[in-house]
C-alpha cells in the first residue's frame, strides 16, 4: 500500500468501497507506522489515562500540538494497542503501552522515555529537528 503523495494522487479515482477494503487490509502495525509519520509529533493515547493526559499537557505546555490518536475511541484501537505494546516492549500488556510518542516519525517510547528526554534536555532538540518547535 502506498502512502503520502503517491497515495493521494491515486486516491482521486479509487472508488470509496475500494478505499474501505484497502484500509481494512492494512495491519495494525502498518497503521501505527502510517499514523506516526503523518505529523511531527504523534501521541497514541487512551482518553481516560492520566499518564496520557500528562504527556499531552507536557507537549501543549511547550507549545507543541501533537496529533493525538485516542485508541479507546477507535474501532480498531485494541489492535493498535497490541501493536504499540510490541513496539515499546510491553510484552503485550496494552495498559502499559500508552501513551506512546513518535517524534519525526521515530518512536520515542512511552511516558518514561519522554520524561527522561525532557529531563536530560534531549526532547527540545528532537522537537526542533522534527519541525514541531521553531524557537
From Swiss-Prot:
Protein localization: Cytoplasm; Nucleus
Keyword Nucleus: yes
Keyword Disulfide bond assigned: yes
Signal peptide: none
Function: Has a glutathione-disulfide oxidoreductase activity in the presence of NADPH and glutathione reductase. Reduces low molecular weight disulfides and proteins.
InterPro entries: GlrX-like_pln_2, Glutaredoxin, Thioredoxin-like_sf
Protein name per UniProt: Glutaredoxin-C5
Motif (Responsive for interaction with TGA factors): 132-135
One GO cellular component, as annotated: cytoplasm
PANTHER family in alphabetical order: GLUTAREDOXIN
All copies of domain Glutaredoxin, residue ranges: 29-134
SUPFAM superfamilies hit by this protein: Thioredoxin-like (SSF52833)
Top-level lineage group: Eukaryota
Disulfide-bonded cysteines: 49-52
Protein's gene: GRXC5
Organismal lineage: Eukaryota, Viridiplantae, Streptophyta, Embryophyta, Tracheophyta
Pfam family, one: Glutaredoxin
Keywords of this entry: Cytoplasm, Disulfide bond, Electron transport, Nucleus, Redox-active center, Transport
Family per record: Belongs to the glutaredoxin family. CC-type subfamily.
Amino acid at each position: 500500500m502506498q502512502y503520502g503523495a503517491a497515495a493521494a494522487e491515486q486516491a482521486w479515482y479509487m472508488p470509496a468501497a475500494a478505499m474501505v477494503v484497502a484500509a481494512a487490509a492494512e495491519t495494525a502495525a502498518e497503521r501505527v507506522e502510517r499514523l506516526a509519520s503523518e505529523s511531527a509529533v504523534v501521541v497514541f493515547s487512551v482518553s481516560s489515562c492520566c499518564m496520557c493526559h500528562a504527556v499531552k499537557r507536557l507537549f501543549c505546555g511547550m507549545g507543541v500540538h501533537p496529533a493525538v490518536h485516542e485508541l479507546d475511541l477507535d474501532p480498531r484501537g485494541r489492535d493498535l494497542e497490541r501493536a504499540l505494546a510490541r513496539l515499546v516492549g510491553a510484552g503485550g500488556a496494552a495498559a502499559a503501552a500508552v501513551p506512546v510518542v513518535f517524534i519525526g516519525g521515530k518512536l520515542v517510547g512511552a511516558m518514561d522515555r519522554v520524561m527522561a528526554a525532557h529531563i536530560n534536555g534531549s526532547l527540545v532538540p528532537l522537537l526542533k529537528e522534527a519541525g514541531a518547535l521553531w524557537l
